[in-house]
């Protein structure tokens, strides 16, 4: 049975509320007729991932629809991505708020919900890909998974008081590993100048 995750379309709006980025500050509504740089893609070695826009489920937090991400096996991954060049070189310390909503149905793994991934570089001096900075809701629970199936949950990626954030490349980013995730405040204390790339 495929695992299904629903990501609120509010993600597009939430990602665009950056301080100091006038061109990016407006809320943008994403729908199948106007993707505005967003799209679905397989992001792993498998081929059993799929993405689409759906109505619901239940009452979506921001409007009537949501983006549905489905994976059919553990080798597959599906992402909703944005490659808008306006985000290249964006200083992560300029983002003032970041939240999104998810719905994990009962066919999904109760420990997994859609994560946020940013391709990052430790500073603006170089433009190389140095891995990803990932926010994973599972790591925000102080005792066990905070993910509740069959209901919408909103994740405040900056307000989590326990973990949540980790880097995929621990050679470049020695702190905030998947085994020892950090809060946003800790990420900024360890690495005050990371930028997107």
Question: Which ranges hold each PLM region?
Answer:
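Secreted extracellular polysaccharide-interacting domains
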Residues: 70-97, 129-137
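Noncatalytic modules at the cell exterior or secretory-pathway interfaces
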Residues: 192-197
